[in-house]
Amino acid sequence: MERKARNKKPKTPSETNNTIHRQAEIYQKALDLFVEKGYDATSMSMIAKALKMCKPNLYYYCPSKEELLYQIHLDDLQKRFIPILDEAEKIRDPEARIAHFLRRLTLMCAASPAAQVLVHELRSLSKTHQRQISAVWRRAYEIFRGAIKELQQSGRGRKGRESFLTFLGTGMALWIVYWFNYSEQNHSEELADLVTQVFLKGFLYPGKK
């Protein structure tokens, strides 16, 4: 005798909003614990306790700690990084495109010590999840490399392997997560300007427009 499939009742807008709010709360609390204790030292039990919820409820939202880290990565990229890429792609001048990208990326990395966790713990994700995160960064790579190539072809940029220059520029911004003093947020704008100026002054021929 066949069982009749049960139709799940669709969520109301209020229920959907509550779910989104709860997910955001879980992501933030988990990320706070990853920053405070380290990813490896943080258990799902600790996260559930900090949220004042039972573990089964936490597993309803995320089946594993690795999946939770992945969802936090995606959420952060969608909210903070992808908008930078969208903005950069609309800038026609390649020098201005690089300047915008480097400045915004530096500010993103300097905004919170959570940036260090997300950069460093990419290695803790499964290969499948790493590939999905890397696909977003591949888009950033192509934007930056394309601008480098345009500047070289126009004679404004120094010759050199495009990939080296791309990793050099983005690496300058990303590496600050390992040494920046996050208690000195008033210096982040100065740092962003410096990273941008140092890279462009080293790469561009002076006086060429």
Protein language model features and the residues they cover:
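Helix-turn-helix
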Residues: E25, K29, L33-E67, Q71
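Amphipathic alpha-helical packing segments from all-alpha helical-bundle domains
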Residues: D75-D86, T128-Q153, S163-F167, D193
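Short coil/turn segments at alpha/beta junctions that flank glycine-rich nucleotide-binding fingerprints
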Residues: E36-D40, I91, S112, S154
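Generic hydrophobic, amphipathic alpha-helix propensity
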Residues: H21-A30, I47, I72-D76, R80, ...
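Hydrophobic/aromatic-rich alpha-helical bundle segments in the mid-to-C-terminal region
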Residues: Q116-H120, Q130-S134, Q152-V198, P206-K209
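Short helix-capping/turn signature of helix-turn-helix
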Residues: C62, H120-L125
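Hydrophobic alpha-helical connector segments
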Residues: Q71, L85-A111, L165-G169
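N-terminal intrinsically disordered/low-complexity leader segments
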Residues: M1-H21, G207-K209
